[in-house]
């Protein structure tokens, strides 16, 4: 080895190995949720918590206590709340009686976040859902309705509105949901399609216009022609969402469905852990480490370089960053780096930024040039959540990964 490498190896060898498990972030602060039906078996719920999830998904009333005992949260799913023909609701007294029964059965269980209503509804169904969620809010204040939206690229006919903005805003204005939730699966052929960033850009804008936080439901299994999960696919989906100011991550799906070519969810069709489970845990623990800082930040801009997806903005418009260089070692020929920068400020007006490597296959060494001279970067550690001086070998990004900085 060369002398400089020997010195670095010696310095690393001299450091004691320290392991830190970040404090768990509550689901009401930043949900990390398995999308789908929650299990009844305590051992499966225990595995969910060990994987870094804080919400088990959609549980039956009878399982809510098991979810609580496992240290998780959930949305209750019950046909007395969500089993209606939304084009022909029964009389209101009948709905009120049904909802009251479910609310009484749930009681004061702190694990229950609210009630699952429907996934990807047509806009014509939302007014009826709004009538039911209005009764829910009256009888169970503080409980949230849960509806997840289509991705923006579906047709107007499937959404039932002339544009995606109108569709998404109905979730807030008609159903009264206190968060936006949507999905957009775009991992194909070793790349993230631009649809993913298009949707983030649109939802971030609507989130700011309606003053409503947003949750992203990301791909966590392989099916159809989507890629198989990896550290890189989880990193890019999660860190891009964080860079856009997202306030929740959901995984479709934690359990591998028993049909088609679905495979490599965190738990397979026989109830066993797959390699995906470990990758999921690794990224979830990073979310727990960063969430206490992220939830205090307000998103002020997101910028892409060198390619700028539709609806998105170029790095030249950044207020904080003049430029970024991304380099590779020993790679011939070197690959052009692709990245995005999310910018934020905290309650004291202090600036933050997050850089995300958009490449799913390559690591890069990076250097950030700030617009204001004399400023320096303080790294928020992805593993402890603590601030630390930016130096040593911190200037490398793994495929899909991101780093949060405070600008001092």
Predicted regions and their residues:
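Positively charged n-region of N-terminal signal peptides that target proteins for export
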Residues: 1-3
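Glycan-processing catalytic domains of CAZymes
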Residues: 15-375, 380-408
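Hydrophobic h-region of N-terminal signal peptides that target proteins for export
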Residues: 5-15
């Amino acid at each position: 080895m060369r002398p400089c490498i020997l010195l670095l190896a010696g310095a690393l060898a001299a450091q004691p190995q320290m392991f830190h498990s970040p404090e768990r972030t509550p689901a009401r602060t930043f949900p990390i949720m398995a999308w789908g039906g929650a299990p009844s078996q305590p051992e499966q719920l225990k595995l969910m918590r060990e994987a870094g999830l804080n919400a088990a998904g959609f549980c039956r009333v009878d399982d809510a206590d098991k979810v609580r005992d496992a240290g998780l949260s959930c949305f209750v799913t019950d046909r007395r709340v969500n089993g209606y023909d939304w084009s022909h609701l029964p009389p209101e007294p009948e709905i009120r009686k049904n909802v009251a029964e479910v609310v009484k059965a749930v009681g004061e269980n702190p694990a229950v976040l609210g009630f699952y209503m429907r996934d990807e509804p047509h806009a014509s169904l939302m007014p009826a859902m709004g009538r039911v969620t209005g009764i829910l809010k009256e009888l169970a204040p503080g409980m949230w309705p849960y509806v997840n939206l289509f991705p923006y690229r579906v047709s107007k006919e499937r959404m039932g509105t002339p544009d995606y903005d109108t569709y998404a805003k109905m979730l807030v204005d008609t159903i009264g949901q206190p968060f936006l939730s949507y999905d957009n699966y775009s991992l194909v052929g070793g790349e993230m399609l631009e649809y993913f960033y298009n949707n983030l850009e649109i939802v971030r804008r609507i989130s700011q216009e309606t003053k409503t936080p947003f949750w992203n439901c990301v791909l966590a299994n392989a099916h159809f022609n989507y890629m198989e999960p990896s550290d890189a696919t989880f990193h890019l989906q999660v860190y891009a969402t964080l860079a856009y100011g997202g306030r929740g991550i959901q995984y479709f799906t934690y359990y591998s469905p028993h049909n088609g070519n679905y495979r490599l969810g965190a738990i397979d069709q026989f109830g066993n852990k797959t390699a995906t489970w470990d990758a999921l845990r690794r990224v979830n623990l990073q979310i727990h480490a960063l969430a206490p800082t992220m939830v205090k930040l307000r998103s002020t801009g997101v910028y892409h370089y060198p390619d700028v997806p539709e609806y998105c903005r170029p790095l030249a418009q950044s207020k904080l960053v003049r430029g970024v260089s991304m380099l590779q070692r020993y790679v011939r020929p070197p690959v052009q780096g692709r990245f995005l920068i999310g910018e934020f400020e905290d309650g004291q007006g202090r600036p933050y930024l997050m850089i995300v490597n958009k490449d799913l296959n390559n690591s890069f060494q990076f250097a950030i040039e700030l617009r204001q001279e004399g400023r320096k970067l303080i790294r928020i550690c992805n593993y402890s959540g603590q601030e630390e001086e930016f130096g040593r070998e911190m200037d490398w990004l793994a495929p899909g990964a991101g780093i949060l900085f405070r600008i001092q």
